[in-house]
């Protein structure tokens, strides 16, 4: 029997999704087509993998770190030509299927303990593109992470992550997932989210993206402080004030009160200011 005797490993963040209704919602959110090539991070025991293959997609490529699960997955899907499997850490190994043709979608119940760095690898970061441009990512993540990704300005969950990801992808929620939907049950709720990475012509200029990343990181390190107290690490207050005024930015606000595009406007002003100083 595949997976007989395997005990979920806490250090790998293993929780098996066993709720068919949630699996169906994930498939629906992925908008699967016959020509789709799917990357699945951490297929585990293969519950989602099986549903993906039943959807008649062209290929499902799994990346799994747990050597015991690799054995079970090979047994479960033996003879399935549309399933390929790679052993390794999704943060470091190549994510390309064996034929070298990249997947176009990511559908995964990703381990909670690597969510942040894995998102950066899959979507890229401000000022740097990802290795592969995916059309859509449908991910099951910890609810607290989903709240930060989807948060609006002024909400307590609005963070540097909110700004970065909302400038890189269109983000939306699919559904909340109760702990009882998993075995073993996690201590927290989860959420299924959709991330549609922006097309190249929708992305900002990379210099502006890098500037946004820099000022957002500095500002949110002191999220309780007003912008006039944090951004002076970048630009003297007497020069910062007219820059902010031109964009209608109130420097008495705190970082979580500014929408992503306001950060972009501020970044552009600071880019111009920086260039003027170098002349």
Curated annotation (Swiss-Prot):
Query: Which cellular components does GO assign to this protein?
Result: cytosol
Enzyme Commission identifier(s): 2.1.1.182
The record's subcellular locations are: Cytoplasm
In which residues is S-adenosyl-L-methionine bound? 15, 17, 42, 64, 89, 109
Q: CDD domains given for it?
A: AdoMet_MTases
Q: Name one Pfam family in it.
A: RrnaAD
Q: Which domain of life is it from?
A: Bacteria
What SUPFAM superfamilies does this protein's entry cite?
A: S-adenosyl-L-methionine-dependent methyltransferases
| Protein keywords | Cytoplasm, Methyltransferase, RNA-binding, rRNA processing, S-adenosyl-L-methionine, Transferase
Q: Which reaction does it catalyse?
A: adenosine(1518)/adenosine(1519) in 16S rRNA + 4 S-adenosyl-L-methionine = N(6)-dimethyladenosine(1518)/N(6)-dimethyladenosine(1519) in 16S rRNA + 4 S-adenosyl-L-homocysteine + 4 H(+)
Quick one: where is this thing mainly located? cytoplasm
> What molecular function terms (GO) are annotated for this protein?
16S rRNA (adenine(1518)-N(6)/adenine(1519)-N(6))-dimethyltransferase activity; RNA binding
**Membrane-crossing segments per the record:** none
Which Gene3D superfamilies does UniProt cross-reference here?
Answer: Ribosomal RNA adenine dimethylase-like, domain 2, Vaccinia Virus protein VP39
InterPro entries in alphabetical order: KsgA/Erm, rRNA_Ade_diMease-like_C, rRNA_Ade_Mease_Trfase_CS, rRNA_Ade_methylase_Trfase_N, rRNA_adenine_dimethylase, SAM-dependent_MTases_sf
SMART domains to which the protein is assigned, alphabetical: rADc
Described by its record, this protein's role is as follows:
Specifically dimethylates two adjacent adenosines (A1518 and A1519) in the loop of a conserved hairpin near the 3'-end of 16S rRNA in the 30S particle. May play a critical role in biogenesis of 30S subunits.
Q: Which family does it belong to?
A: Belongs to the class I-like SAM-binding methyltransferase superfamily. rRNA adenine N(6)-methyltransferase family. RsmA subfamily.
Q: Which NCBIfam families match?
A: ksgA (TIGR00755)
Query: What protein am I looking at?
Result: Ribosomal RNA small subunit methyltransferase A
Q: Which organism is it from?
A: Prochlorococcus marinus (strain SARG / CCMP1375 / SS120)
What does the record give as the organism's lineage? Bacteria, Bacillati, Cyanobacteriota, Cyanophyceae, Synechococcales
The gene that this protein is the product of is rsmA
């Amino acid at each position: 029997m595949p997976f007989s005797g395997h005990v979920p490993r806490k250090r790998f963040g293993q929780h098996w999704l066993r709720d068919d209704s949630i699996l169906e919602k994930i498939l629906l959110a992925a908008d699967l087509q016959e020509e789709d090539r799917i990357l699945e991070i951490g297929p585990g025991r293969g519950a989602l993998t099986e549903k993906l293959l039943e959807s008649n997609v062209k290929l499902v490529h799994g990346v799994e770190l747990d050597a015991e699960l690799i054995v079970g997955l090979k047994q479960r899907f033996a003879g399935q030509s549309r399933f390929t499997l790679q052993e390794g850490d999704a943060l470091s190994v190549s994510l390309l299927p064996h034929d070298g043709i990249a997947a176009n979608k990511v559908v995964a119940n990703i381990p909670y303990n690597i969510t942040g760095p894995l998102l950066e690898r899959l979507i890229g970061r401000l000022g740097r593109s990802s290795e592969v441009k995916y059309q859509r990512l449908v991910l099951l993540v910890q609810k607290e992470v989903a709240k930060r990704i989807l948060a609006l300005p002024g909400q307590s969950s609005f963070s540097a992550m909110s700004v970065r990801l909302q400038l890189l992808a269109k983000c939306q929620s699919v559904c909340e997932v109760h702990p009882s939907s998993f075995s073993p049950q996690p201590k927290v709720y989860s959420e299924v989210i959709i991330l549609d990475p922006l097309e190249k012509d929708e992305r900002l200029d990379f210099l502006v993206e890098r500037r946004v990343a820099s000022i957002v990181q500095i500002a949110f390190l002191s999220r309780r402080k007003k912008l006039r107290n944090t951004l002076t690490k970048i630009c003297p207050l007497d020069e910062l004030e007219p820059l902010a005024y031109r964009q209608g930015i109130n420097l008495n606000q705190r970082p979580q009160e500014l929408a992503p595009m306001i950060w972009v406007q501020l970044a552009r002003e600071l880019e111009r200011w920086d260039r003027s100083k170098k002349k």
